[in-house]
Amino acid sequence: GDTQDDSLYIQVLGFNEDGTKVCAVYYRVFSGDTAQGDVWREYSEFVTNYRAKTEDGRTLPISLCLLDAGGHRQNHVLTLTLANPRIRAVRGRFYATEGKRHETALVDRVSSANALIGSTRVKCMLVYCGTICAKDLIYTRLRRLLYSENPQQESTWFPSTPMCGHDDGYYKGLMSNRRVDV
């Protein structure tokens, strides 16, 4: 998920058993002032209560939600991870700015960060993600999907109905990023 001053975002993904295929199941924007509690409560309830229905009729909950804690409302994100065990804070790392030339891992490391609850500091889990590695993986899979003669056989696919939140605006935003080599 992503955090902005005026909204929270969630992209629900479904994976096959060995993790080699992923499907974008549902996308939603939670509008509201993220300095206030209502939008966070709504987000947490969605993560807890959402169920995806499989083709064979099973219902699956969200087992893990990664929410960006690298900018907007970091303390709110960290506090939410304490309240909802399905939500984890994640922060992107861009290694070219840190003296390293190449990333090789999607998940770089797991660390901790302090959340301030009232006047008490509490340690929270924080997952660091290699942003270049993640974007390369996503855009390689998207490129294969776009040019595939049989999209359902690819490792990544999206529903064809905008009812799942994947409307034209979603795809324009997804494809607005461009790779720049540093």
Predicted segments, located by residue:
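Two-metal-ion RNase H-like nuclease active-site motif
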Residues: 1-5
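Structural motif
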Residues: 9-11
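Residue-level signal for short segments within beta-strands and strand-turn junctions
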Residues: 14-16
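Mg2+-dependent endonuclease catalytic cores in nucleic-acid-processing enzymes, primarily RNase H-like
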Residues: 19-182
